[in-house]
């Protein structure tokens, strides 16, 4: 009686136990002792501990969708799927040739003519009125900006407004101011020699504290000033009625008429004296 109650409880607690047809198994029930009589044998057999691992190598039996891919394959090779069997989504857009390299630009006449035809085939495109408004807006803005571009050159800010005048000398021009002593020494040298030599030029530059270039330029300017003065005197003499050659470059101060050079009053009082030669013969 006690043993049967234990078996019923054991069957409820361990549903995995199975009855054996032979009834010779004594799993789950032990003996009470060595001298006592053993309990009656139960008709249950112990089930395997992990029934869900039974038949794990046989994957074909557990596949509910049909035959598997075969025997055990490499663990690094994923199963291949045949993508050709799956049809792609239906294309609603028209096919565009890939070799057409001249695609119409947005806002161009070709694009405006192409817009309605492509809109008829594509349901997600803009309406015709919207495309026309975009084209008109683009043309309006381009027309509004083009006159301003033509009026304002990108290099207009670089152009400097220069007032054209007859004067060539500017205020920013660097000018050397000679001292009175330097001018006096240069004038003395000019009266002695109108064209200075290289040796004398270097000596003057050292003595006066100037550069040879400054001495050379001073002599050039001094000769130009003298030519201007001579030309001015010649023009004044021609206006008074005299006739003198007007080329000042070929006239030296000794060739000018006596009207330009006044003789001192002391020299005027002298009269030429006739000197008679007397020859004495023995």
Swiss-Prot record:
Residue ranges the UniProt entry marks as DNA-binding: 171-230
Record carries keyword Transcription: yes
Family: Belongs to the Caudal homeobox family.
Compositional bias segments (type: Polar residues): 110-124, 133-148
InterPro entries: Caudal_activation_dom, Caudal_homeobox, HD, HD_metazoa, Homeobox_CS, Homeodomain-like_sf, HTH_motif
Locations listed in the record: Nucleus
UniProt record, GO biological process: anterior/posterior pattern specification; blood vessel development; labyrinthine layer development; negative regulation of transcription by RNA polymerase II; placenta development
Gene: Cdx4
Organism phylogeny: Eukaryota, Metazoa, Chordata, Craniata, Vertebrata
This protein's name: Homeobox protein CDX-4
Keywords from the named record: Developmental protein, DNA-binding, Homeobox, Nucleus, Transcription, Transcription regulation
GO molecular function, one term: DNA-binding transcription activator activity, RNA polymerase II-specific
GO cellular component annotations of the record: nucleus
Gene3D superfamilies, per database record: Homeodomain-like (1.10.10.60)
Skewed-composition ranges (Low complexity): 20-29
One Pfam assignment: Caudal_act
Region (Disordered): 13-36, 98-156
């Amino acid at each position: 009686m006690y043993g049967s109650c234990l078996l019923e409880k054991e069957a409820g607690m361990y549903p995995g136990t199975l009855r054996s047809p032979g009834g010779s198994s004594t799993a789950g029930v032990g003996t009470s002792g060595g001298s006592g009589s053993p309990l009656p044998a139960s008709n249950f057999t112990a089930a395997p501990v992990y029934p869900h691992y039974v038949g794990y190598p046989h994957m074909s039996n557990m596949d509910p969708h049909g035959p598997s891919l075969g025997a055990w394959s490499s663990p690094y090779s994923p199963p291949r799927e045949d993508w050709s069997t799956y049809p792609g989504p239906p294309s609603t857009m028209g096919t565009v040739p890939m070799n057409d390299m001249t695609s119409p630009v947005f806002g161009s006449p070709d694009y405006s003519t192409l817009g309605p035809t492509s809109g008829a085939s594509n349901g997600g495109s803009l309406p015709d009125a919207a495309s026309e408004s975009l084209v008109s807006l683009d043309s309006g803005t381009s027309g509004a900006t083009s006159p301003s571009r033509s009026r304002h050159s990108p290099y207009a800010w670089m152009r400097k407004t220069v007032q054209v005048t007859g004067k060539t000398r500017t205020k920013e021009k660097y000018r050397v101011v000679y001292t009175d002593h330097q001018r006096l020494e240069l004038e003395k040298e000019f009266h002695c020699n109108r064209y200075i030599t290289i040796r004398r030029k270097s000596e003057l530059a050292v003595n006066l504290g100037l550069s040879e270039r400054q001495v050379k330029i001073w002599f050039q300017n001094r000769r130009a000033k003298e030519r201007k003065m001579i030309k001015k005197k010649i023009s004044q003499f021609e206006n008074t009625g005299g006739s003198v050659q007007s080329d000042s470059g070929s006239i030296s101060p000794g060739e000018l008429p006596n009207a330009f050079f006044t003789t001192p009053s002391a020299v005027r009082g002298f009269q030429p004296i006739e000197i008679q030669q007397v020859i004495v013969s023995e």
